[in-house]
Amino acid sequence: MKTSMFLTLTGLVLLFVVCYASESEEKDFPKELLSSIFAADSDFKVEERGCLGDKCDYNNGCCSGYVCSRTWKWCVLAGPWRR
């Protein structure tokens, strides 16, 4: 049952890619498709996110309101549940 669902889903994905490729007149289709899927707005990275998720260590601190996680070594929100 799981195998047939996986094969069906894989077939649908391949059908979508083939249909999209046949309609596309661009020669660098894979690069364009991947760049459109993983495109990110540069303003969103800097202004919205702030320091959340930035790598840190105890010598190199985080922004105001964030602390360096002992476990993962990145900046997380400071709160009463943090030790």
From Swiss-Prot:
GO molecular function: carbohydrate binding; ion channel inhibitor activity; toxin activity
Residue pairs linked by disulfide bridges in the UniProt entry: C51-C63, C56-C68, C62-C75
Removed propeptide positions: 22-49
Cellular location(s): Secreted
Keywords, comma-separated and alphabetical: Cleavage on pair of basic residues, Disulfide bond, Knottin, Lectin, Secreted, Signal, Toxin
Signal peptide: 1-21
Source organism, top-level taxon: Eukaryota
Main location: secreted
Pfam families reported for this sequence: Toxin_12
Keyword Membrane: no
Tissue expression notes: Expressed by the venom gland.
Record note on domains: The presence of a 'disulfide through disulfide knot' structurally defines this protein as a knottin.
Role of this protein: Agglutinates erythrocytes.
Name by which UniProt lists this protein: U5-theraphotoxin-Hs1a 3
Organism: Cyriopagopus schmidti
